[in-house]
Amino acid sequence: MTVTVAPSATSIGSTTGRRSHPLLKATVVAGLVAAAAATAVAAVAHAAGVPLAIDGEQIPFLGFAQMTFVGAVLGGLIVAALNRWSGRARQRFQVIAAALIVVSCVPSVSLPPDTATKLTLVATHLLAAAIIVPVLARRAAP
């Protein structure tokens, strides 16, 4: 007697027995790329004379990278939760991501006193979102 077992859709093993984690890999790669891009934009803006300071405190370049990567990880966790417990995960993730992008831009618009810093902070948010959201949305269940 022969028994055929269909491969699991949630865990795909390779020939070496290792498990594939496409959402984890996508989250890390998108987070690193977005963090580098946001930091580069901040560095270019600072070199061009944008103060990048809030209440007299300079925003460290590492802060751009850290917070961007944290945002990517949170996005990956949201996709994982939606894939597990929700129907139409992709659509719901896109709505949640759009709302979080808007909310995350509020301090960028309200805190810095100068327009150049505000524009730079919003630009880094939008650039990071443009990199992270499509990558994670592709990993969300349709």
Model-identified regions with their sequence ranges:
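Membrane-water interface at the C-terminal end of transmembrane alpha helices
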Residues: A26-A30, L127-P142
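Transmembrane alpha-helical segments of multi-pass membrane transport proteins and ion-pumping complexes
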Residues: A34-H46, A72-A80, V109, A129-P134
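Core segments of alpha-helical transmembrane spans in multipass integral membrane proteins
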Residues: F61-A81, V95-C105
